[in-house]
Amino acid sequence: MPKSIMLVSLGAVVGAVARYLLSEATERMFGHHLSEGGFPYGTLLVNVVGCLVIGILGGWGVPDLSNSTTRLLLITGLLGALTTFSTFGWESLELMQNGKVGVALVSIGLNVVVGLVAVYGGYLVGQYFVSEVVS
């Protein structure tokens, strides 16, 4: 098996399990599931966590996000399996089809805005770690 497939697979296993555990914990905490008319908190959480992590990695310069090994393991594998654009899209459509257009728009807005804020915040945290280690 090529090294690239092994790296993506390893990262994806960790990311998928983390996604499942975070989504389940979120559902238990809030007691709502989308099928019961609830807000898709689990999807929002995993997407924001993924954005935060990629921001931290980018700000920290771990080791170089354009490095193929790092990118395959952490970005394509781990964060690719952790975050979920397709589920986000499906849940948004499902909310709209069920007449919850306002809830869908809030979910869309939160995923996009909070996700971008998390990437930037993570980047600043990563930069802070770099400045502390170098100093």
Model-predicted segments: where are they?
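Membrane-interface helix-loop junctions in multi-pass transporters/channels
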Residues: 1-135
